[in-house]
């Protein structure tokens, strides 16, 4: 019997997420793609990008052990949210650790806290995840706008919840290389510079809405991983 390919392995993880809640799949797929795109911009090694890519999928696997009501409602109080969702964070990291993915587990144990993680990859993942979490719909709300998401990222940096260097480097490239009018306007209003993307730069991958709404089916068919 032949061993499954990495492509098949990822599709299995995505199938599990989809069967639980479709938005979990959408979020992990978008997050994984963005981790690869920003990882290249930030000069991460292939191993580091691979770790972030896997973390994007494993971060939601813990949801398989949550009651559905936890995935369908928001929480006004952050402490209550952490308490209700702790099972997701704990189980996701444990699944990764038991799979032998120690570096992935470290990222998943640190990224969700309102503090700058000690691990560098966790710091990178935390920032990308914060953007994705804002821009993707949840089980209990629609996606936030670009301006709202930029404000939240800036606030995280100012309050010491996320690494300021990574936050502003991410925003800089997000704003500079997007050609989507809505994001350009949000960046300008928020005081970030914008510029047309260099031909063939690949930087436009940071904004999956560049050519209209993000296509889940296209992302699922991508062999970029």
Regions found by a protein language model. Name each.
Residues 77-80, 138-146:
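Short, charged, surface-exposed loops that flank catalytic or proteolytic processing sites
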Residues 52-56, 93-127, 132, 141-212:
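Histidine/acidic-rich helix-loop-helix segments that form or flank divalent-metal centers
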